[in-house]
Amino acid sequence: MIVSTPHGMNMFYKLWTDAKSKKNDYIPVEVHWSEVPGRDEVWKEETIRNTSQSQFNSEFECEFLGSIDTLIAPHKLKVMPYVDPIQSHADLDIFERPDPAKTYFLTADVSRGTSQDYSAFLVFDVTQMPYRVVAKYRNNEIKPLLFPQKIYEVAKAYNECFVLVEVNDIGEQVANALQFDLEYDNLVMASMRGRAGQILGAGFSGGRAQLGVRTTKSVKRVGCSNLKQLIESDKLLIPDYDIMSELSTFVVKGSSHQADDGCTDDLVACLFIFAWAVDQQYFKELTDNDIRERMYREQKDQLEQDMAPFGFIDNGIDDPEVEVDEYGTRWTTVVRDHNTDW
């Protein structure tokens, strides 16, 4: 018997959902607070007043997503399905095998390999929308010297896909190894454009080019905003449980978003780097997909209904008489006030 209070999409959440869908041998039994003698609406209001709504939802409403500060809306996270990978080996989970007719895009987040954080990458099918995660790698012990080889092998398998590496810290070493040691051709670069920030490209667009993207506050803010829109509008499909688990603990911290205390966000970092990239002109040229234009067309009718047309109000005062002569000059009548010089 396993007894637990729901708290986030952790291991117990997976055991519970698998039991409800009969994927394991556990029998799910749920006890709601209203079934306990002596607990009524008065008790509920008093408990919420002394704690918080999110804490009550988690401890007594048996909701795994008690937080309301997640980047992705909790009601969306609840209905996002996950599936088992068709193949798993050496920390690599594959959900769809490579298809020679499709286009793929890989984003990587690099750690120092000290077991505190994970080095991770995700492979996306960007042939058409909705985009899909087709492969995932995550390891908290792999060293930066070995991580480029893993990226290289998977990227080559997925049709030599485009690769975008986060280069804030040790990631620059990984990007350099891919470019110069392994001579991988499809490494995506970014150029600094002054106040415009970083622009995705192949290194020929002017400005100071770098191998990969530096996760600045601007990149993260735009990436998180785009990611929220992509997921909540079903333009990005995520079949992986680990990613959804990280999304359930990726919460507001100050003016930004980051993993909750004791949690990680390396897979989410791969997601918001991808979400930042999809709105770049270079990405649209690579994939022939304009996500902004596509979403606008789908929501055009709703947007036009929300934008009420401007009208004209008759204030009851006649406009002054205007005469236009043959030369186009406009003449108006002036009424003289005898109490002045006019």
Positions of the model-derived regions?
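ASCE P-loop NTPase helicase motor core
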Residues: 1-51, 174-179
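Conserved beta-strand scaffold positions in the cores of enzyme catalytic domains, especially
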Residues: 2, 28-30, 105, 186-189, ...
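Mg2+-dependent endonuclease catalytic cores in nucleic-acid-processing enzymes, primarily RNase H-like
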Residues: 9-11, 15-18, 127-254, 309-342
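ATPase catalytic-site recognition across NTP-hydrolyzing enzymes
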Residues: 35-110
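Short, flexible loop/turn motifs enriched in small residues
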Residues: 101, 114-120, 130
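Conserved hydrophobic/aromatic positions in well-ordered beta-strands
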Residues: 122-124
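Charge-patterned, long linear interaction tracts outside catalytic cores
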Residues: 239-307
